């Protein structure tokens, strides 16, 4: 089993299948189908991310360089967590965007959902 250690943003443990993206993760585009149409399989809707497009992200360890896109990232992650549609964890190779991190932090405080964020 591969173990990662890094700067913890939201603590937790994660044992899950990894999904690896070589490009940035557009939070809104990736979760649009789950949020708008109730896709319970949580398939990535970002057509500009060939590594993740149409892959189920539910309960997976997302290995990403960084988040990209608009300022909605935090709210999208909070909403995904509050609906229990989140990945098991998100591992970032670059510094984590504070707006995106805020969504996971708020979900950790305000809900019973957990989304660990680690900068490796």
Segments predicted by a language model, with ranges:
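Feature captures the catalytic cores and cofactor-binding loops of soluble hydro-lyases/lyases
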Residues: 2-15, 19-117
